[in-house]
């Protein structure tokens, strides 16, 4: 067992699962963290558990959050439809402050575990335009981690690792395949049905499908239509 630990934010989707595989390839003992935050696509929690089991992580933790009560996103508010037309600008699927909340909790757990790093599968190339997926956001949170934690003050700051941030979706798929990721276990769709079948029309589905097409890899995604 490795003597270096990492917390991996795992949604059950393509990117976060690849980030987990990268962390394992770098020799980290991995602790996966997922959130039940009132999201529309709750089957992602089943996928996160499935991925964590298949990849034999040290521990998988699910934290309960009530972001649904805040609303403001198509992923947490049933009255806001998930767009299927590739809108310009920041889409309504953006969940206000989500990555800030997630990373803050990951930071706390990482301190408790005496972990060295937190991995998050954000991407700023083939992505939906979320402000909390950009390199400058991650750099700002890294500064916060150095200032707001005991380990940071003591000169042993946790590293926020974003191995996918400058990669295309095709490059992510290709790397994951080389690392042995089983993408059939993952769910990326914003409105997947209870059987985990993807809609094939939302922005997340389009990006995922394009990634497999550009990588010239077979897409194992189960689509409802």
Curated annotation (Swiss-Prot):
ATP binds at residues 10-20. Its EC number is 6.3.4.20. Gene3D superfamilies: HUPs. Binds 1 zinc ion per subunit. GO terms for biological process: queuosine biosynthetic process. Zn(2+) binds at residues 189, 199, 202, 205. Pathway: Purine metabolism; 7-cyano-7-deazaguanine biosynthesis. This is 7-cyano-7-deazaguanine synthase. The gene is queC.
